[in-house]
Amino acid sequence: MARTDKVGTHKTAIYQSDGYTVAQSHDTQIVRFNTDEIILNSGGWQTKTTKSRMNKVSDAFQLGFRVSQRQGEWFVDYFANEIGDTYSFNDGMILERYKEVNYA
């Protein structure tokens, strides 16, 4: 069953679907993630609000990404295992989540 949580000053639905945790704003699943990957999607709404909600989801679930805008273009800064990378934003982009290495 879906639960609606506040992300920022507006309600964003947070729920489980097909093995993913999903953050949905209006009709768009803006962030989907599981233990292996994070999928970002603006639904074509590259607005300050969408960007802010994505970043608040990242902060709330400690996903390690930050969406920013430079000269009108969106970028994603992704930090995993203390390694930072910057990517051009594309709807449906997938960030691979890094696994911790366990030594016996």
Q: What does each of the following model-derived ranges do?
A:
Residues 1-104:
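Terminal leader/tail segments of proteins
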